[in-house]
Amino acid sequence: MAKVYEFLANGFEEVEALAPVDILRRGGIEVKMVSVTGSNLVESSHGVVVKADLLFENITDFSDADLLMLPGGMPGSKNLNEHEGVRKALKEQFEKGKRVAAICAAPLVLASVGLLKGKKATIYPGMESYLGEDAEYTGALVQEDGNVTTGAGPAASFPY
């Protein structure tokens, strides 16, 4: 069975975090929401508190993952970007040729780790500069390029 980990930091966007988890779980895919806050309770950018399945610090590695996923939102995306463990896990996943995905503002994390070099990508409108010069911004609602999927914002939560 496919396995997905979604990283949650305080300030995440609710729809971008929960819609993909709900859809994937309904499809029979094992999805684990992983808190990077040190607590299972993670607060969204609009004050909604979600209980994550796992704590990042209790996981030794993510080698069993088929996909690592990042929801957007602010300051959630910046908080994910500041978490060295998340950055390392994404890089290792990408280097193994496995899938990574980020939506809304969260593609900035993929870009800062260097995973968007030479890739087509999208991001929340107005944040294009966060993709850096190495990515090709497409403006698409959802963009796939190899093992990387990016989404432009809340409206992309379902097709993403």
For the regions a language model picked out, list residue spans one by one.
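Active-site-adjacent pocket-lining segments in enzyme domains
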Residues: 3-6, 12, 23-39, 53-160
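A cross-family phosphate/adenosyl-ligand binding-site feature
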Residues: 44-53
